[in-house]
């Protein structure tokens, strides 16, 4: 007679990753916290559902009350700081940390009222629910290092300096390259990062191209070749350039000879130009439809209204067409330390942090819709960050997603049979996929 079934192998793999990262030690062996973290990887749900999630696997859970007491401890005892230290030690165990990626997202709440933290602000999902801004700092492979939380109506540009300074202070870091998208590009941010002796690489807004490339347009017109790189300078503030457009050669940026500028790198791609042209054509067609009264004029580009009459802004369309295919980058790293190609490739590592956000918002469903106080929200994000670290560790080690790891191992159950009062445990027969996962993790298969 079958007495019980347990997905012991799945839990062992998750627990081993959690332990290898030093998370158990970081939280003082808090079993309830570990159960909340690992349960998120199996099935994203509320804390109150953790006993059910573990029960479905044939595993024993602590009580719901114990889980919520653990959340309170997470804030009282500084679990996040200890976890961040463990993750930093994991990342730097095999070498130094030279580059970090930063991005932000919004997490919304299905709530009727705002409070001090949960504010209605700009939402990437175009929602009007109260929300918080979450910033995530990861290494160049997308492994999480630090998470921050701000009021929902705070400008994204105001989040990067506090989280980077906190990270520097916590780990005694003096030299670091920070990579962020154009949303972080404010003059104050770049000056603050530079003052902190940090290097940065950020995306440039295309609207800067006419000024940065004024000499190129003067000498070459708007002709570019596929893969062309223009390494030049851009004003730190305003639009007044230190560039002498009467000289054809681009200046080599140096902080001493160009104190009012940063280094700017512009790259032209035929593939990007085709994509940009397609987008512009669609926008111009929409503008024409709005002018003709066929579509509603909500936020339409290339439409100008004068004395109540809507007209097509042909000059803006022509200006936009002259910039298709261009992508810009701003940095304070001199060419002697990093060539243009390396700056560009470093920036394009940003997809790792975007992937981490997708994991935390979709695979892990990080939205803390059930939490109502700042401490509870912060504790929830600590759980999410720990879960994301375990997920990234397993994904990097095996080359497959956490969702697939859970799917492959969940059905492999250890069965306990009661044979005339004698209890016999039977290990599951491993699939090829399960064997591959265990081999990649150097985890021995269960004994038969």
What do these predicted ranges mean?
Residues 1-4, 8-448:
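Anion-binding and metal-coordination hotspots
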């Amino acid at each position: 007679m079958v007495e019980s079934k347990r997905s012991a192998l799945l839990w062992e793999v998750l627990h081993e990753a959690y332990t290898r990262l030093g998370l158990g030690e970081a939280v003082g062996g808090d079993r309830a916290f570990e159960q909340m973290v690992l349960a998120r990887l199996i099935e994203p749900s509320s804390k109150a559902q953790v006993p059910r999630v573990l029960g479905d696997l044939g595993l024993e859970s602590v009580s719901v009350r114990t889980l919520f007491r653990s959340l309170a401890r997470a804030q009282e005892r500084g679990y996040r700081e200890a976890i961040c230290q463990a993750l930093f030690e994991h990342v730097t165990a095999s070498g130094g940390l030279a580059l970090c990626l930063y991005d932000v997202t919004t997490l919304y709440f299905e709530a009727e009222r705002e409070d001090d933290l949960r504010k209605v602000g700009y939402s990437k999902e175009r929602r009007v629910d109260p929300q918080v801004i979450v910033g995530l700092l990861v290494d160049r492979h997308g492994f999480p290092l630090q998470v921050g939380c701000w009021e929902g109506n705070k400008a994204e540009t105001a989040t990067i300096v506090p989280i980077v300074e906190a990270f520097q202070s916590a780990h005694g870091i003096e030299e670091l390259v920070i990579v962020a998208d154009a949303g972080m590009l404010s003059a104050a941010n770049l000056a603050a990062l530079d003052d902190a002796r940090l290097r940065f690489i950020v995306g440039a807004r295309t609207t800067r191209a006419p000024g940065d490339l004024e000499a190129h347009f003067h000498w070459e017109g708007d002709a570019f070749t596929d893969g062309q790189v223009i390494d030049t300078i851009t004003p730190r503030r305003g639009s007044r350039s230190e560039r002498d457009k009467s000289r054809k050669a681009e200046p080599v940026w140096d902080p001493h000879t160009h104190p009012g500028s940063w280094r700017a790198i512009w790259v032209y791609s035929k593939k990007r130009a085709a994509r940009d042209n397609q987008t512009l054509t669609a926008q111009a067609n929409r503008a024409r439809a709005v002018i003709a009264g066929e579509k509603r004029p909500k936020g339409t580009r290339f439409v100008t209204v004068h004395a109540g009459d809507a007209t097509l802004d042909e000059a803006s369309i022509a200006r936009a067409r002259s910039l298709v295919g261009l992508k810009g980058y701003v940095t304070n790293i001199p060419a002697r330390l990093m060539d243009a190609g390396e700056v560009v490739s470093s920036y394009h590592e940003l997809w790792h942090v975007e992937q981490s956000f997708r994991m935390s918002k979709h695979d892990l469903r990080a939205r803390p819709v059930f939490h109502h106080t700042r401490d509870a929200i912060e504790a929830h994000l600590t759980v999410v960050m720990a879960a994301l670290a375990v997920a990234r560790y397993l994904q990097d080690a095996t080359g497959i997603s956490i969702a697939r790891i859970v799917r492959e191992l969940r059905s492999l159950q250890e069965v306990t049979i009661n044979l005339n009062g004698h209890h016999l445990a039977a290990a599951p027969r491993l699939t090829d996929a399960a064997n591959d996962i265990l081999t990649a993790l150097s985890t021995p298969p269960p004994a038969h």
